[in-house]
């Protein structure tokens, strides 16, 4: 099994193969990807769809001298396997294993780290211009999906690239008509019309030579969705940007891909190759439902993904989705917005029930936030469902377009804190720090499912921009209460009181997901625990009361320590005039790698045992140094 694949330790081995061996290699590679992902979990549909394209690129171009940048990066498993990491695939996305995304520190073939979308053309253009300036003769290639092409950054890069007439730049549009959620908007409709223009590529002067080696475009067009008879295809958007447009060609046909790429290799200036692929190619279950198989956990390939037979705890994403539907039923002003994450953000049911108030704006976080601001000015109640890591992309809009005008937009921030197997690129580590400094913002962190629901309801009642952060995955098992209860603004609650005598009293000020492990640590240490709830406005009265009745204060958050929730507590303490030693616990001043979420928390000292250990070493051991006012541990 895998007789050909076992001979490939790097692309140089691939380039030594006879052309006739490449399709059998593709079959082995696809089977290997399926087998690997079924054992580790990970992205599947997208990787099954890029097998032939990956082989063709490494076969034609002299990698790593020629640079390949993979947009988003979750479709790079075939690339990793062909570039020396075949025998490490069992560790994919595991603790201390290889990353699920390109990483420069992992391989010289990973020329640019990616994970967020629409960055590849900018990076590849920079490489192409850099190579020119250095006098190097190499191609720089960006592989970008049709979903990622809806983001403005991709077109900013193309606008810049189009005037670089001598750059050896190739942009490959991997057109599978499928981002995580179906691509939306006028641009996608334009691409669909372009793709369905049956005689377009053959008729274009200057492209006939490149395409002459490929099967007739007419044959490919029969596989594509046809539009109304007699439709006139508009001039391509890509040529208007100064690119030489080539295609579309079948992205699963090596006899089309390889000679086309060989011809492109001889050209100069920006080239744009349009390839049509199918997500899940070669595995019928994934072909039929590429969303379900986009990022599965472990499963049996022979049986496919089966529903769990054991009752699962409700996820925070499900809590949000149910809350949004309930609020929309009560109030016709509620509008839901997602930047291309309908399934991931829990908005499938909302779209079905409230289609006229559901807006998927595509991979356009900046637009999503300002669009929400515009809705708010008209008296509507916009709710932006967004991952913490993607809100970073709309920071200026958050400040300039929403907070500065004090517009009542609700930000439902999913995937806050560490995110496990997706790693540092997707971690929600910074939202508390970067939002806390913005005037007019209210920020809450949920400690359980019902508190999340009630916080979201509270946020919807506020006259200013308000954020509720909650983590990825299942909650604590707390049942949600159907009736809504508004949480008093800026008020935390004490969940446990110490019985220790004076001189040993420790108060733990916990935020969001850190309430549960803090309670576990408190049981061991007999400490007080406060569920702070609000990061802004922080409960200054509670901070003062705890400082006055305890000897030591500890803040705990699943976010970066620098500038985060703990810093808000220290600032409140300084304002109170009460001096107490403070220990701040949170994520370290470094990027936390991928792996099991529980293991990563333990690594950061943020599980119950780690919190107790830090407190004991800092305050309660005979050698403890409690001099000074505050100390950060991360």
UniProtKB/Swiss-Prot annotation:
Pfam families registered for this protein in UniProt = DXP_synthase_N, Transket_pyr, Transketolase_C
Record carries keyword Metal-binding: yes
Q: Name one GO cellular component term.
A: cytosol
Which co-factor is required? Answer: Mg(2+); thiamine diphosphate
**How does this polypeptide assemble, per the annotation?**
Homodimer.
Stored HAMAP family: DXP_synth
Q: What is this protein called?
A: 1-deoxy-D-xylulose-5-phosphate synthase
What organism is this sequence from? Burkholderia orbicola (strain MC0-3)
Q: What gene is behind this protein?
A: dxs
């Amino acid at each position: 099994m895998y007789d050909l694949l076992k001979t490939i330790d790097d692309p140089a081995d691939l380039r030594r193969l006879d052309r006739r061996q490449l399709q059998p290699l593709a079959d082995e590679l696809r089977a290997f990807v399926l087998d690997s992902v079924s054992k580790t979990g990970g992205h599947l549909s997208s990787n099954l769809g890029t097998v032939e394209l990956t082989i063709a690129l490494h076969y034609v171009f002299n990698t790593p001298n020629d640079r390949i940048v993979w947009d988003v990066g979750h479709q790079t498993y075939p690339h990793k396997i062909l570039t020396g990491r075949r025998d490490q695939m069992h560790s994919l996305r595991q603790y201390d294993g290889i990353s699920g995304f390109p990483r420069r520190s992992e391989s010289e073939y990973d020329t640019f780290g990616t994970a967020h979308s629409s960055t590849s053309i900018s990076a590849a253009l920079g490489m192409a211009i850099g190579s020119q300036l250095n006098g190097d003769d190499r191609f720089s290639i960006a592989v970008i999906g049709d979903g990622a092409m809806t983001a403005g950054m991709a077109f900013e890069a193309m606008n810049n690239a189009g005037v670089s007439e001598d750059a050896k730049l190739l942009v490959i549009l991997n057109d599978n008509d499928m981002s995580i959620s179906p691509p939306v908007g006028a641009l996608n409709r334009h691409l669909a019309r372009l793709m369905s223009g049956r005689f377009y590529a053959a008729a274009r002067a200057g492209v006939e030579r490149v395409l002459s080696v490929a099967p007739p475009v007419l044959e490919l067009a029969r596989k594509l969705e046809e539009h109304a008879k007699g439709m006139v295809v508009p001039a391509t958007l890509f040529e208007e940007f100064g690119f030489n447009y080539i295609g579309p060609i079948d992205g699963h046909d090596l006899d089309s891909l390889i000679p086309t790429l060989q011809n492109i290799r001889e050209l100069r200036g920006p080239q744009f190759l349009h390839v049509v692929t199918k997500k899940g190619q070669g595995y019928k279950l994934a072909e039929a439902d590429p969303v379900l198989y986009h990022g599965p956990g472990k499963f049996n390939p022979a049986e496919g993904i089966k529903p769990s037979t054991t009752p699962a705890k409700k996820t925070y994403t499900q809590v949000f989705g149910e809350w949004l539907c309930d609020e929309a039923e009560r109030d016709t002003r509620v509008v839901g917005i997602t930047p291309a994450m309908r399934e991931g953000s829990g908005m499938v049911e909302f779209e079905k029930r409230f289609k006229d108030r559901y807006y998927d704006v595509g991979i356009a976080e900046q637009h999503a936030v300002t669009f929400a601001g515009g809705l708010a000015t008209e008296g509507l109640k916009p709710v932006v469902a967004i991952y913490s890591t993607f809100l970073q992309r709309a920071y200026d809009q958050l400040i300039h377009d929403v907070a500065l005008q004090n517009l009542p937009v609700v930000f439902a921030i999913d995937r806050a804190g560490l995110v496990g197997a997706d790693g540092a690129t997707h971690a929600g580590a910074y939202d508390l720090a970067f939002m806390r400094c913005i005037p007019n913002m209210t920020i809450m962190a949920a400690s359980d499912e019902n508190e999340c629901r009630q916080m979201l309801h509270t946020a919807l009642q506020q006259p200013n921009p308000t954020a509720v952060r909650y983590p990825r995955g299942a909650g604590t098992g707390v049942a949600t209460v159907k009736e809504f209860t508004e949480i008093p603004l800026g008020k935390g609650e004490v969940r446990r009181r110490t019985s220790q005598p004076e001189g040993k009293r420790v108060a733990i000020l916990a935020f969001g997901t850190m309430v549960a492990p803090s309670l576990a640590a408190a049981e061991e240490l007999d400490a007080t625990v406060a569920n702070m709830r609000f990061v802004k406005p922080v409960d200054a009265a509670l901070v003062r009361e705890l400082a006055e009745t305890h000897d030591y204060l500890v803040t705990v958050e699943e976010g970066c320590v620098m500038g985060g929730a703990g810093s808000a507590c220290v600032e409140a303490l300084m304002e109170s005039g009460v001096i107490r030693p403070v220990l701040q616990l949170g994520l370290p001043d470094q990027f936390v790698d991928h792996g099991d979420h529980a293991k990563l928390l333990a690594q950061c000292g943020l599980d119950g045992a780690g919190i107790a250990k830090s407190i004991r070493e800092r305050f309660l051991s005979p050698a403890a140094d409690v001099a000074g006012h505050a100390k950060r541990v991360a």
